[in-house]
A protein has these predicted regions:
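Hydrophobic alpha-helical segments and helix-packing faces
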Residues: 38, 60-64
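Short, glycine/charge-rich flexible loops or terminal/linker lids adjacent to PRPP-binding catalytic cores
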Residues: 78-107
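Glycine-enriched loop-and-adjacent helix/strand subsegments that border the catalytic/binding cleft
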Residues: 6-8, 60, 81-84
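Short, hydrophobic/aromatic-rich beta-strand segments within well-structured domains
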Residues: 57-58, 69-70, 81
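Short, catalytically relevant binding-site loops at active-site mouths
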Residues: 63-66, 87-89
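Short Gly/Thr/Asp-enriched flexible loops that form oxyanion-binding sites at enzyme active sites
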Residues: 66-75
Protein backbone atom coordinates (compact mmCIF):
# COMPACT_ATOMS: atom_id res chain seq x y z
CA UNK A 1 0.00 0.00 0.00
CA UNK A 2 1.26 3.48 -0.86
CA UNK A 3 1.18 6.01 1.96
CA UNK A 4 1.78 9.70 2.51
CA UNK A 5 3.69 10.64 5.68
CA UNK A 6 2.21 13.41 7.81
CA UNK A 7 3.11 15.00 11.13
CA UNK A 8 0.15 16.67 12.80
CA UNK A 9 -0.54 17.78 16.37
CA UNK A 10 2.81 16.35 17.47
CA UNK A 11 2.07 12.88 16.06
CA UNK A 12 3.32 11.01 12.99
CA UNK A 13 0.97 9.03 10.78
CA UNK A 14 1.18 7.32 7.37
CA UNK A 15 -1.95 8.17 5.36
CA UNK A 16 -3.11 5.53 2.88
CA UNK A 17 -3.22 6.88 -0.69
CA UNK A 18 -6.70 6.29 -2.12
CA UNK A 19 -7.81 6.57 -5.75
CA UNK A 20 -10.83 8.83 -6.18
CA UNK A 21 -10.79 9.06 -10.00
CA UNK A 22 -8.28 8.18 -12.71
CA UNK A 23 -6.69 11.61 -12.18
CA UNK A 24 -7.26 12.18 -8.47
CA UNK A 25 -5.67 10.46 -5.49
CA UNK A 26 -5.94 11.58 -1.88
CA UNK A 27 -4.14 10.82 1.34
CA UNK A 28 -7.00 9.57 3.52
CA UNK A 29 -6.81 11.33 6.88
CA UNK A 30 -9.16 9.18 8.97
CA UNK A 31 -9.46 9.57 12.74
CA UNK A 32 -11.88 6.67 13.32
CA UNK A 33 -10.26 4.30 15.78
CA UNK A 34 -7.30 6.61 16.51
CA UNK A 35 -8.17 8.13 19.89
CA UNK A 36 -4.68 9.57 20.41
CA UNK A 37 -4.81 11.45 17.10
CA UNK A 38 -8.39 12.63 17.67
CA UNK A 39 -7.60 14.10 21.10
CA UNK A 40 -4.39 15.76 19.89
CA UNK A 41 -5.99 17.27 16.77
CA UNK A 42 -8.98 18.58 18.73
CA UNK A 43 -6.64 20.24 21.23
CA UNK A 44 -4.62 21.93 18.48
CA UNK A 45 -7.67 23.06 16.49
CA UNK A 46 -9.24 24.60 19.58
CA UNK A 47 -6.11 26.71 20.04
CA UNK A 48 -6.89 28.31 16.66
CA UNK A 49 -10.48 29.28 17.47
CA UNK A 50 -11.09 31.13 20.73
CA UNK A 51 -14.33 30.03 22.40
CA UNK A 52 -15.86 33.51 22.03
CA UNK A 53 -15.24 33.57 18.25
CA UNK A 54 -18.02 31.15 17.23
CA UNK A 55 -21.61 30.32 18.10
CA UNK A 56 -21.79 26.72 16.91
CA UNK A 57 -19.56 23.83 15.87
CA UNK A 58 -20.43 22.21 12.53
CA UNK A 59 -18.81 19.36 10.62
CA UNK A 60 -19.54 17.12 7.67
CA UNK A 61 -20.66 13.55 8.21
CA UNK A 62 -19.04 11.11 8.85
CA UNK A 63 -15.26 10.93 9.15
CA UNK A 64 -14.96 14.11 11.21
CA UNK A 65 -17.59 13.21 13.82
CA UNK A 66 -15.07 11.86 16.36
CA UNK A 67 -13.04 15.06 15.95
CA UNK A 68 -15.92 17.47 16.49
CA UNK A 69 -17.17 15.38 19.40
CA UNK A 70 -13.76 15.66 21.05
CA UNK A 71 -13.57 19.39 20.29
CA UNK A 72 -16.97 19.87 21.94
CA UNK A 73 -15.90 17.78 24.92
CA UNK A 74 -12.64 19.69 25.43
CA UNK A 75 -14.28 23.10 24.98
CA UNK A 76 -17.31 22.34 27.13
CA UNK A 77 -19.74 22.88 24.23
CA UNK A 78 -23.12 21.30 24.95
CA UNK A 79 -23.98 20.78 21.25
CA UNK A 80 -22.44 20.41 17.82
CA UNK A 81 -24.03 19.95 14.41
CA UNK A 82 -23.46 17.44 11.60
CA UNK A 83 -23.98 18.23 7.90
CA UNK A 84 -25.28 15.16 6.05
CA UNK A 85 -25.57 14.29 2.37
CA UNK A 86 -29.31 13.89 2.71
CA UNK A 87 -32.18 14.25 5.17
CA UNK A 88 -33.29 11.39 7.40
CA UNK A 89 -36.77 10.61 8.74
CA UNK A 90 -35.77 11.68 12.26
CA UNK A 91 -34.98 15.24 11.07
CA UNK A 92 -38.20 17.28 11.39
CA UNK A 93 -37.04 20.44 9.55
CA UNK A 94 -33.54 20.07 8.09
CA UNK A 95 -31.65 22.88 6.39
CA UNK A 96 -30.98 21.76 2.79
CA UNK A 97 -28.10 22.88 0.51
CA UNK A 98 -27.05 21.24 -2.78
CA UNK A 99 -23.34 20.45 -3.01
CA UNK A 100 -21.08 17.95 -4.81
CA UNK A 101 -18.83 15.49 -2.98
CA UNK A 102 -15.31 14.94 -4.35
CA UNK A 103 -15.16 11.40 -2.99
CA UNK A 104 -18.51 10.08 -4.23
CA UNK A 105 -19.11 12.36 -7.25
CA UNK A 106 -22.72 12.73 -6.15
CA UNK A 107 -24.87 15.66 -5.07
Amino acid sequence: MHTYPIDVAGLHRELPICKVTDDLYIGAFIVFGDAELTVACARELLKLVPADSYDYMLTAEAKSIPLIHEMARQSGAAKYFIARKGPKAYMPDPLHVVDKSITTAEE
